[in-house]
């Protein structure tokens, strides 16, 4: 089984640093392939990669998002066929749309190739400026992430961090947000929290789908709209013909 993760973020946000952290603390026992492009951040030192057992396949054709249906997809398939890695980490260009990269990855998904979590790095000091100046690209990276890791948190005030959190939450209210100093942030804990959140969301989605199908097949509601109700009194059908789901108290 090969898991594909994407680590995105604008230039200088700290993608390379985070990837090194994950390789050392989270994926050290896995066979990993790193795919990056020449317009990304300064490449990770080849000596470090060799010691970590990581292979690099550079995209010489340019930005990863400029050749999604051709060069990138072919290269990705070659990596999987040649190396049979446990994990592939894709570091796309800082100006690439994360949604486009994910679409390209979906082409190679199979029973043996799984899409992992997408992580976006946000420079907490530049968040407001980038949202204003690079809105479309920046918002796309945030919206399509399962986790957002804030960098440079040691150099700004708590108010500045909270401002950035509020801005990101307005775009993505489901992603796991990390505002901890990277010196205190453990790669294993980070990955575990992201996966726990993803499993919870999938479980909730499955439960909602089950409840919806159960409601549809158990009999029609005579109320306008035919929606579920949390209070029997709010339903004109007086409880006949379908179940009413009580609100779960947390």
Regions found by a protein language model. Give the residues of each.
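Compositionally biased, low-hydrophobicity segments enriched in charged and small polar residues
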Residues: 39, 111, 143, 147, ...
